[in-house]
């Protein structure tokens, strides 16, 4: 992916945006990819190296990354696992997902989200429900007891 800086944002923001992008692997499907249409997903993978995005369009992505960084720095309790990537082979593909927090005492997966207040105004959380359901499934496949999931939403506006 080609990252541009057409609005001349500070260099650290541009550098962060460039360091954050990894080419997608052909046989790996990330949990967040499941919320995309199949054509969108495969076209993105096929043309990733041609795609262009300006750093000014990534500010809210950086905000979300900053929130996750703060949460990740919090001390993990003995009954908690945080920011862990799980993978499950399904045929020729690998389903890969990184959950934010699993609490073994509560048997709950927590996912931190940054969003607009409009997410709540429109009351459509189906994408979040799908994502956390897959995290629950991946954790169960890895041998953990999971009773459910919760979302901690931080609204940016």
Ranges and model annotations:
Residues 1-109, 116-129, 140:
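Metal-dependent nuclease catalytic cores that hydrolyze phosphodiester bonds in DNA/RNA
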Residues 111-114, 153:
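Residue-level recognition of conserved beta-strand positions in structured domain cores
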Residues 142-157:
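Substrate-binding beta-hairpin/strand module that engages nucleic acids
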């Amino acid at each position: 992916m080609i990252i541009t800086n057409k609005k001349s944002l500070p260099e650290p923001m541009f550098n962060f945006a460039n360091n954050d992008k990894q080419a997608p692997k052909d046989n790996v499907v990330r949990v967040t990819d499941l919320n995309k249409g199949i054509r969108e997903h495969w076209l993105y993978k096929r043309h990733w190296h041609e795609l262009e995005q300006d750093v000014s369009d990534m500010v809210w992505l950086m905000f979300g990354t900053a929130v996750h960084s703060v949460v990740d720095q919090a001390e993990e309790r003995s009954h908690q696992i945080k920011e862990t990537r799980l993978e499950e082979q399904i045929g020729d593909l690998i389903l890969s997902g990184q959950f934010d927090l699993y609490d073994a005492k509560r048997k709950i997966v927590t996912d931190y989200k940054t969003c607009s207040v409009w997410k709540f105004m429109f009351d459509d959380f189906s994408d979040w429900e799908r994502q956390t359901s897959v995290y629950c499934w991946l954790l169960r496949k890895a041998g953990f007891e999971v009773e459910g999931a919760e979302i901690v939403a931080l609204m940016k506006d």
